[in-house]
Amino acid sequence: VLYSLNDTKKSDAVLKGIQNDIIEQVGESAFNIGFSGGLDSTALAAISADVLKRDKVTLVHVIYGPYTYSKTLENVLTLSEKLRLSLRIINMRQVQEKVLKNGPACNRCTRKVKIAGVRKTIKDKNTLVGTGANLSDSWGDYGMKMLNGIYAPFLDIGKDEIRRFLTHYSIKEEEVKIGESKFREGCKAKHLLKLMAVPRYHGHSVCLSNEILLDILSQTGIKPDIANVKIVGPLKKNIALINISPLPQAGITDEIVLRLKKIETVDEVILVDAPLELKVKANPSIFRSATARARLEAGPLGRDFADKTSIHWEESPNNKLHTFHVVDCRKKQEA
């Protein structure tokens, strides 16, 4: 990536400000960084390794069992070694499954699973928890860099600036990517757009289908902007929606469809090559809020799909559903 001289000078000034802020806020305290191995947490780890005593910095990777991409763990191990920082791995699979039992809930998962997992490693009350949360995250809504012992030094900056930090520390963007998305990556569980009522059925389908998808694309050398398998449908039927953008040649997509059809917990496979209509049941607190519905339409029900989506909302009488559930879908051309 090429930047102008003015961009470089501005970036250097921003980086210097972040470095000074970390030195001032952390000081001699222990600093445990929630480390996903992604863009944001890697940039924070690199800066911290540069300006703090290394023995005061610990990278904490919260693993979700099979819901963690294998490439994620590979990146975490490689980067922690490259940065020469100690690494702790905390397994929070069962907690995550419990959180998602009542429907998709990424923000709640961040609080109850990811941050809670990092907090488990704290032995000294003066230890700070570091997060790479920035302007692109909902965390930014709080507008506070320091909140309840959690420190977010990137809160006022965006992704472009953070990418420049990586360049400054000679870390290539490929080192922090897993191939799921050019934009925002995470765990496999976020692609389950229904209640995780039975992990061995609902969880198994989203784990295996997404791992197979990335494995096939990796073998072919394809690096799409979006690559995921969303699992939707009623509780007793798992419908796998294959999202790849741009769409590769038919031979590759045919192989992906064939492989996914062999998964025992996948009941139907659909390649998203046209706009989709999604039938979504929602908790009353979401259904009755235009703002909440709009956020979901722009986020998990719109972002990371290979084509446009239109949503038909219904209020759910199921008191076990705390968020939303995509109960059905069809391609618009079939309407």
Q: Predicted segment positions?
A:
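Short, non-transmembrane amphipathic alpha-helical segments
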Residues: 244-270
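Generic alpha-helical secondary structure
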Residues: 111, 206-213, 249-257
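Mid-to-C-terminal catalytic subdomains of enzymes
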Residues: 163-228, 269-283, 289-302
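ATP-dependent adenylation/nucleotidyltransferase module used to activate substrates
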Residues: 1-168, 240, 257-266, 278-335
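Short, flexible, solvent-exposed loop/turn segments with mixed acidic/basic and small polar residues
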Residues: 142, 228-234
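Intrinsic-disorder/low-complexity, polar/charged segments
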Residues: 7-9, 38, 205-211, 242, ...
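Generic beta-strand/beta-sheet core signal
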Residues: 132, 243-245, 272-274
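Short, aliphatic-rich beta-strand segments
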Residues: 59, 233-246
